[in-house]
Amino acid sequence: MYQVRKRDGKIADSLISVEDIQDSVESVLIQAGYDDVAKGYILYRKQREKIRNLNSTLLDYKEIVDSYVKVTDWRVKENSTVTYSVGGLILSNSGAITANYWLSEIYDDEIGKAHKNADIHIHDLSMLTGYCAGWSLKQLIQEGLGGIPGRITSAPARHLSVLCNQMVNFLGIMQNEWAGAQAFSSFDTYLAPFVKADRLTYDEVKKCIESFIYGVNIPSRWGTQAPFSNITLDWTIPDDLKNLPAIVGGKEMDFTYGDCKEEMDMVNRAFIETMIEGDAEGRGFQYPIPTYSITRDFDWSETENNKLLFEMTAKYGTPYFSNYINSDMEPGDVRSMCCRLRLDLRELRKKSGGFFGSGESTGSVGVVTINMPRIAYLSENEEQFYKKIDRLMDISARSLHIKRTVITKLLNEGLYPYTKRYLGTFENHFSTIGLIGMNEACLNAKWIRKDLTHSEAQAFTKDVLNHMRERLSDYQEMYGDLYNLEATPAESTTYRLAKHDVAQFPDIITAAEPNGTPYYTNSSHLPVGYTDDVFEALDIQDELQTLYTSGTVFHTFLGEKLPNWKAAAALVRKIAENYRLPYYTISPTYSICRNHGYLSGEQHKCPYCGEEAEVYSRITGYYRPIKNWNDGKTQEFKERKVYNITNSRMRPKTPSALTADPVSAAETASGAALSADGRSPRTFLFTTSTCPNCHAAAASLEKAHIPYEVIDAEKNWDLVQKYGVMQAPTLILVRDGQVTKLANASNIKAYAERKV
């Protein structure tokens, strides 16, 4: 002990901590040459530390089961898609164990404490999986369902009915390997050739689509949930697909996707009619959540399908709309993520595929949400605010990198067999950092004290979002992973973080009215009771939502259904043509009576029979009965002011408020960035090893007898940068010092056919 004390001058008031003594003992043993004794002592210390921490990692099995069965824990309603059931109990039990495993065995103390203390919220701790994923429907059509040793394998579907069954099974299987939404892109485009090949009647098509919709709404997922499914529908044949051979039964047909417009319309009509009809009691289908592409060539005329689409929008609020008119997105983005080249590690990419969906072969490995109101409350000034947010972003980014490393190891070890078979890697998946309560952060900030309806708060929020974007670029350089900034949907996070904050800081400002259940406003949304003028809200949100790279959506909350389909179409068009935000919905409230079916608006009792009715509204992003919502979201619904479309007035917008026309997939340039050396004609085909369409592009050139040079884009960055190549396949034509760039296989095929 003398040796130890002689080495340690940190004794104060004749007291010394146990940790200081043990540190000194370790040091003395090592310096004295007692290596074996030192090793044993270190192991002993670690064992004692685990015993001391045992109480924090032990779970009380009785409390876990009782809290669910007796509904004493608010987390029973944490997710409104999980109904009270034995499946929900099993999910609750396993989730508690898995969350404990993440926090005590995988994440370090700093990460674990930040979550437990509600500085951040790590989503989906109850799952040892990634968050969300988009899948290639084309791959399923080409390869069939299976390929896993010891499991049943189905050959590529040759008929629409078989494909619909395979899609239901595929989504159900994948949902068990992921925590969140599963998505297919170009649903109508890829299904249309099956209709054409078998010359199906409309009734036959509708029966197939009905089987798909009912199938994905069956609670087959863990926790007695239906698979959380999202589909994007093109409505018109996309440019990057229209010239490609259609695929049925795993084989190329003698017609292209562009030849299937009539059949595509049949698929869309069948889907919408089924969604409008609802189930046997008139209840709207929860899944799949459809996202429709609003492009410049969208046909707004009074077609039968347009009437159906906007009737579904007016009545149930089912669809999401992707704004390809004024946003910085392109329709082909949902299919090109795995082909995009990472020219700049600091470039923040958009996560495509809709609000909950993901583009093909992309998605998110995990989400961490930062508690913005608490940061503002604890900060004396802006400088402190940014220091605190940087620290929490560092913790969040590190936690996501750890999660990516862990689930990648588990993927390679076979824990997610179907994900390994159809995806193979998480390289194209994002690490997602989100935020909540920016409105309340501005109210708590001592240097603002105003909500987001004021210009000072809006300007500060823009600065914060841009600061976070820069920080994410730093993490991409540091870790080599994709990072994105999300407007977190925050179904349960909004309540959990506010509940913690009120308990620790009674005078903190939350979104709730005095004496109401605490909650925070999602991301940088406006106060839910601010205005009934939708365009007033859009004018503010358009400046903020465009700074996010995923998860952002504007919900047009309505008190009841719109009077007719024309009113819905006019509103959807007006938003797309005058605003830049990428995703939006029309979201009416409606009710369901078991005897009389659909009722417009919020009606807790049926006006016809007096029976109790279910009131449905959109929670974060999907429709669920309000009775299933957690207390925080229920409080938000009570305070929500719905928009009055009749009294809403659009303000004049300056030309600079909207973006310029997007660059075409085929472009010609002669500037420095695209200049060619010499004047001899050359043709380059840029490809990557993971690109699914590069072979098709090469085949088109060879069929037309066009000579070309293959450039491996991953190994020739100098040429990639010289010619401004952003994705594979890309064809570069050098003619007389001019450079023409053709991106995607469809444009390359069209060029080759013109040369024949």
Role assignments for model-derived ranges:
Residues 1-63, 425:
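Charged, amphipathic alpha-helical regulatory modules used
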Residues 735-756:
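Non-catalytic, surface beta->alpha helical segment in thiol-disulfide oxidoreductase systems
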Residues 47-51, 57-427, 448, 454-608, ...:
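Conserved catalytic cores of very large enzyme subunits
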Residues 178, 182, 226, 425-442, ...:
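Conserved phosphate/anionic-ligand binding catalytic regions in large, soluble enzymes, centered on
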Residues 604-657:
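Long insertion/accessory domains within large nucleic-acid-processing enzymes
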Residues 723-732:
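Structural micro-motif
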Residues 670-704:
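Local sequence-structure signature of Cys/Sec-based thiol-disulfide redox active-site neighborhoods
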Residues 706-718:
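Thiol-based oxidoreductase modules, predominantly thioredoxin-like and allied folds used
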